[in-house]
Amino acid sequence: MILLISDLHLEEERPDITRAFLELLGGRARAAEALYILGDFFEVWIGDDAMTPYQLSICQALRELSDSGTQIFLMHGNRDFMLGKAFCKAAGATLLKDPSVVDFYGEPVLLMHGDSLCTRDEAYMRMRRYLRNPLSLWILRHLPLGTRRKLARKLRNESRAQTRMKANDIVDVTPDQVPQVMQEHGVRTLVHGHTHRPAIHKLQIGEQAAKRIVLGDWDRQGWALQVDEQGFQLAAFDFVPTQLALPGSP
């Protein structure tokens, strides 16, 4: 059994989401062959050298899962694209390129965060190309921590404001992009997050049936895609109501 999640947007200000994630790590994920996290794992990430005690506790929780035998794969999102090799090494995770084709029980499946499919949002795509440029990344990683924190707050606030102003179809995937990218990678199944619109969409690519599975964001409830030999099951679950102690708390 394989689990896929995305868009947890983990931050210390949302202990309910953190508790739900830790519950997943201690439960279903222990029985999984692998856990795939397809971006926006953290609400913000300014560099592996700037881990807060809270972020370090999440890293340690992932390491415990990895040490138990579950493989962990992390993909960058638009909020945490500066996650690096140091964090992944400490967490016992493998950094996965976006996009990546993986084999799930004999079927090739395309995994993406999903933001690169939203090509109608031209302003965002320009910003994405700039921020993901290797030179830009090098500069960002070498800025003073205080500057990085201010820049992260500015980008996050601007992103939230712009998203509220944009039409729904602009911030969703571009319909023509989906079959195009699936054909380019030779797959009939695409799994992505980013849009916060969980669903399984049935498609027709040429003469072949296909599907696009959109993972849900963790806000009022959690979402996980379970893959096994019987197929794909996307389901929501309620957050854990009990007041569990967070890692690192007294």
UniProtKB/Swiss-Prot annotation:
Gene3D superfamilies registered for this protein in UniProt: 3.60.21.10
Amino acids binding Mn(2+) 2: D40, N78, H113, H194
Membrane topology type: Peripheral membrane protein
Chain sites annotated for binding Mn(2+) 1: D7, H9, D40, H196
Matching SUPFAM superfamilies: Metallo-dependent phosphatases
Cofactor dependency: Mn(2+)
GO biological process: lipid A biosynthetic process
Matching InterPro entries: Calcineurin-like_PHP_ApaH, LpxH-like, Metallo-depent_PP-like, UDP-diacylglucosamine_Hdrlase
Pathway stated in the Swiss-Prot or TrEMBL entry: Glycolipid biosynthesis; lipid IV(A) biosynthesis; lipid IV(A) from (3R)-3-hydroxytetradecanoyl-[acyl-carrier-protein] and UDP-N-acetyl-alpha-D-glucosamine: step 4/6
Keywords: Cell inner membrane, Cell membrane, Hydrolase, Lipid A biosynthesis, Lipid biosynthesis, Lipid metabolism, Manganese, Membrane, Metal-binding
Pfam families per UniProt: Metallophos
Enzyme Commission number(s) from the entry: 3.6.1.54
Residue sites binding substrate per the record: N78, R79, D121, S159, T163, K166, H194
GO CC list: cytoplasm; extrinsic component of plasma membrane
Chief place of localization: membrane
NCBIfam families found in the cross-reference section: lipid_A_lpxH, PRK05340.1
Function as written in the Swiss-Prot or TrEMBL entry: Hydrolyzes the pyrophosphate bond of UDP-2,3-diacylglucosamine to yield 2,3-diacylglucosamine 1-phosphate (lipid X) and UMP by catalyzing the attack of water at the alpha-P atom. Involved in the biosynthesis of lipid A, a phosphorylated glycolipid that anchors the lipopolysaccharide to the outer membrane of the cell.
Family to which this protein belongs: Belongs to the LpxH family.
The protein's name: UDP-2,3-diacylglucosamine hydrolase
Lineage: Bacteria, Pseudomonadati, Pseudomonadota, Gammaproteobacteria, Pseudomonadales
Gene: lpxH
